[in-house]
């Protein structure tokens, strides 16, 4: 058993810094590279791509990342764990295998492919069997929107990743695993933590929670003393140095920008935390109220004292469904009286839509630069140098939303003076993909692990 296992984060979302994975494997010693690509809306995007082309449906940025880190995997034994499989883990694995062969590393990768989280093809069967997949916020059954569902994926835990590592995989590709499982799984594998080692498992979850968003815990998007954080253009992504007892240090590679401090780690700890006594995952429930966070040197933070308890018998399910259409148009009004001009344009546009008989589920106006973020707390903004009118509509009928998009440009000549920001053309109509969170019994979600070479 290793005394210390180093897990580095290389992606915090699909669209993150493309060069970060390479920097993490080249910047210093690590054992595992964790790449987190998936968010709730990402699954529906990937499902649409797969519908158009059955060979797609995964985070294609991962394939390029694998090409950049391939030497580290082959020569230094760094292992890769990523949820880049999206709704098509086998296709993702095939693409990675092809990259390895193209780069002269045929047979060097043992790719673990985790499937079973995708419930889209089983929805009708599950509903008929008494699993209503009720919305966690409203209590409504999924049957209300079943005909508009785009994707449905259960959040799976660390067990299938641990299984893949146990079968000798040096690259593990999952679909909708929890973000935290990508870090906890290698620790559980290396330290042989048992299924009821609640405190150690909870420590793995907290480690994963801290680094799952990439550089957000190493100086990026940090509110505390943000002006003094150095060299964010070369920000160092985080890594954890974990021990068998569950304690770990959060740090980053030397000669990189950003900062790892008690403040940066603490800000990330409370990100999407929910109940601090019960941070629920498929593997364990972690208690965040017992955590100790202490400085352990420059850019080093020691995390300890973590407690855990048994998980529930449910898994969370992320469902995405079609919910109509939207369009957003913008115009910029400048001083003097910028806000007053934008407000007049808003009234003109609303009256114009009413006269045309256009009806929408919602019309939303924001005055960016005046009160879009702080609302009535913004204070007197009558002397703002410029204000952007941001006018959006949503509704079930695409044609009605499309008609709205033709009403923004006429305001340039027919509305208040001192207007700019209209050179981008008419607003685009976009389909709305809504989120439906639900729970399902763990017993009905069966994961499968295949290892290909």
Question: Where are each of the predicted segments found?
Answer:
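A conserved active-site cap/scaffold subdomain adjacent to cofactor or substrate pockets
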Residues: 201-307
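N-terminal amphipathic/basic leader segments beginning at the initiator methionine
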Residues: 1-25
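Gly/Ser/Thr-rich loops at beta-strand to alpha-helix junctions
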Residues: 13-14, 39-41, 84-93, 176-182, ...
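C-terminal non-catalytic interaction/assembly regions of soluble proteins
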Residues: 304-453
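N-terminal glycine-rich anion-binding loops that anchor highly charged ligand groups
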Residues: 28-46
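Gly-rich Lys/Arg/Thr-decorated short loops/hinges at beta-loop-alpha junctions or inter-strand turns
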Residues: 1-3, 40-55, 74, 119-147
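Catalytic or ion-translocation cores adjacent to nucleophile or general acid/base/metal-coordination motifs
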Residues: 102-119, 184-225
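Flexible, glycine/charged-enriched surface loops at secondary-structure junctions
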Residues: 106-110, 217-232, 276-295, 352-368, ...
